[in-house]
């Protein structure tokens, strides 16, 4: 199918390709290649690539490596802003629909499971209570995320399984929802039902190979000047005050190093270990989704396999 393939269809729903999978599987590069084939544009679904200046540590593709493909919902928030999935949902859907109005195909790309679902699925967000939130955040500051995660595990094991014990922001949010008297946080995630006509593609590969990729990625981050990036964000952009960005993989560990909590070798080791744990969490999030067509990220013909799947999907809707 040529890049000028028509996106017209008898269906009224906007079409979107969703490309997901664990960190270090090559999603960003594949998305660019597919976008060139299918007259498409990329919409980011990585929760940390929305932050300006967080480039090396998030493996954000530099503009020169995007090969002229438009990317959306990148670099939209300062590192001091606390993440809002509801706000991200608004930005992502606006981008998807604007791309579609111009007759192009949106490709949503990322490994942040909740952001992916917020962008394309029937997902609504409970309200907030500033008093409850403030009390929980004070407990977080006093006792650390692991203590609150243990409480969440007692109250809602499903939610605790989906949230990293170090992710204080999401733990606080889950506990807040419970205290508001809403149904259990995990139970509020609806069945898999998209608001768009969506094709889901997933990339993964064998654990030993993925672990090796993670180690090589972290080594490349350090070689590319990651410590200097974190230092600049901390000294000039307020990274330490950012409740979300300061806890990102790698950034948290380097901030600890800069504050004298460990040496550089230990910060690097902790980054590798934390990233490998995160990969396991990503898999546990994406694997139950029956809509995902899984592809081998190590396949030399990966681009061809993905393109054929997209072509078949588009043909079935012509």
UniProtKB/Swiss-Prot annotation:
Keywords: ATP-binding, Magnesium, Nucleotide-binding, Transferase, tRNA processing. Its cofactor is Mg(2+). GO terms for biological process: tRNA modification. It catalyses: adenosine(37) in tRNA + dimethylallyl diphosphate = N(6)-dimethylallyladenosine(37) in tRNA + diphosphate. Substrate binds at residues 23-28. The record marks 112, 133 as: Interaction with substrate tRNA. ATP binds at residues 21-28. Residues 46-49 are annotated as: Interaction with substrate tRNA. It holds the Pfam family IPPT. It is an enzyme of class 2 (transferase). Its EC number is 2.5.1.75. InterPro entries: Dimethylallyltransferase, IPT, P-loop_NTPase. One of its GO terms (molecular function) is ATP binding. Catalyzes the transfer of a dimethylallyl group onto the adenine at position 37 in tRNAs that read codons beginning with uridine, leading to the formation of N6-(dimethylallyl)adenosine (i(6)A). Monomer. Belongs to the IPP transferase family. HAMAP family: IPP_trans (MF_00185). This is tRNA dimethylallyltransferase. It comes from Acidothermus cellulolyticus (strain ATCC 43068 / DSM 8971 / 11B). The lineage of its organism: Bacteria, Bacillati, Actinomycetota, Actinomycetes, Acidothermales.
């Amino acid at each position: 199918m040529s890049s000028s393939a028509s996106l017209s269809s008898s269906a009224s729903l906007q079409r979107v390709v969703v490309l997901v999978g664990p960190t270090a599987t090559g999603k960003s590069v594949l998305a660019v290649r597919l976008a060139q084939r299918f007259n498409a544009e990329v919409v980011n679904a990585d929760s940390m690539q929305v932050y300006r200046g967080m480039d090396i540590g998030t493996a954000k593709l530099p503009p020169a490596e995007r090969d002229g493909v438009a990317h959306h919902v990148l670099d939209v928030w300062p590192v001091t802003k606390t993440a809002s999935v509801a706000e991200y949902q608004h930005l992502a859907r606006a981008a998807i629909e604007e791309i579609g109005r111009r007759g192009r195909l949106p490709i949503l790309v990322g490994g942040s499971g909740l952001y992916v679902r917020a962008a394309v699925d029937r997902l609504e967000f409970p309200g907030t209570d500033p008093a409850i939130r403030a009390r929980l955040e004070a407990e977080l500051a006093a006792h650390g995320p692991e203590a609150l995660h243990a409480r969440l595990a007692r109250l809602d094991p499903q939610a605790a399984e989906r949230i990293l014990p170090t992710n204080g922001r999401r733990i606080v949010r889950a506990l807040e929802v419970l205290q508001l008297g809403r149904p259990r946080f995990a139970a509020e995630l609806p069945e898999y039902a998209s608001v768009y006509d969506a094709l889901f593609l997933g990339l993964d590969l064998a654990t030993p190979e993925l672990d090796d990729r993670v180690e090589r990625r972290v080594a490349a981050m350090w070689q590319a000047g990651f410590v200097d990036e974190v230092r600049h964000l901390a000294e000039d952009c307020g990274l330490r005050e950012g409740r979300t960005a300061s806890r990102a993989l790698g950034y948290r560990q380097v901030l600890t190093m800069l504050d004298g909590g460990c040496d550089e070798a230990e910060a690097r080791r902790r980054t590798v270990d934390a990233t490998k744990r995160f990969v396991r969490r990503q898999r546990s999030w994406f694997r139950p989704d029956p809509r995902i067509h899984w592809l081998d990220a190590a396949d030399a013909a990966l681009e061809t396999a993905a393109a054929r799947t997209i072509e078949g999907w588009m043909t079935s809707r012509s």
